[in-house]
């Protein structure tokens, strides 16, 4: 009967969900990021930027601007491009790395490439006229495309590279943020945009002896 068929379907669905839940549980780690080795001591070199010359310095910047964007990957760049489209050209971009790219700045190891079709993944293709050379672009091509976006939309003058956020405090009486950085910058802004990613730091397995 139809009623019995519905029962069988419900049982099959419950069984499938139980299997998926069991597999998910196998892959969950209660120790979170504690499962990884700390990037210190013999592993300290993994916490440095291999793509820049050591010893970079610059004078601290003290300024007021409309917006501060944290992150120079696609999220940060697209935010900046959209601000320019809206007529806002008074903003700063703060990026830990030495160039635009985010994930694709840090991850350039041999064979690294995107697992999403390039024509879907890469933004602003119509605006830049860029045509990916492969269905799944290599990390190198994506990084170079990020640089192209930076040049095409004139984002480089807005960027503070090799710089990290130290603090961001909202002052209600002044109606602004005070953003301080690892370079001693003090930047006041009305809008503070967090556009950072999660794939910029090495995660080494916490296996004894390695």
Where are these regions (language model features)?
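N-terminal Rossmann-like FAD-binding beta1-loop-alpha1 element of flavoenzymes
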Residues: 63-93
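Non-catalytic terminal and boundary segments that flank Rossmann-like NAD(P)-dependent oxidoreductase
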Residues: 9-60
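Glycine-rich dinucleotide-binding loop and its adjacent helix/turn
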Residues: 40-57, 64, 122-132, 138-142, ...
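Short, solvent-exposed loop/turn and secondary-structure capping segments
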Residues: 103-105, 190-191, 202-208
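Glycine-rich FAD pyrophosphate-binding loop
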Residues: 84-109
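Feature captures the FAD/FMN-dependent oxidoreductase FAD-binding
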Residues: 132-200
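Short, small-residue-biased leader/transition segments that mark boundaries at the very start
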Residues: 1-8
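Glycine-rich active-site loop/strand segments that organize a redox cofactor
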Residues: 19, 29, 105-145
């Amino acid at each position: 009967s139809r009623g019995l068929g519905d029962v069988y379907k419900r049982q099959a669905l419950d069984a499938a969900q139980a299997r998926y839940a069991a597999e998910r549980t196998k892959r969950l780690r209660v120790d979170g990021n504690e499962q990884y080795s700390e990037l210190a001591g013999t592993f300290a070199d993994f916490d440095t930027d291999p793509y820049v010359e050591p010893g970079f310095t610059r004078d601290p910047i003290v300024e007021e601007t409309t917006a501060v964007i944290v992150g120079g990957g696609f999220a940060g760049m697209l935010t900046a491009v959209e601000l320019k489209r809206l007529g806002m050209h008074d903003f700063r971009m703060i990026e830990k790395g030495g160039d635009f790219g985010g994930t694709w700045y840090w991850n350039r190891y041999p064979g690294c490439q995107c697992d999403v079709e390039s024509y879907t993944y890469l933004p602003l293709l119509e605006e830049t006229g860029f045509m990916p050379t492969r269905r799944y672009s290599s990390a190198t091509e994506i990084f170079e495309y990020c640089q192209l976006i930076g040049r095409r939309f004139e984002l480089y003058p807005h960027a503070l590279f090799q710089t990290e956020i130290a603090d961001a405090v909202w002052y209600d009486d002044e109606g602004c943020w005070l953003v301080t950085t690892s370079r001693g910058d003090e930047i006041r802004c009305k809008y503070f945009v967090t556009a950072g990613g999660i794939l910029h730091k090495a995660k080494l397995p916490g296996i004894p002896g390695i």
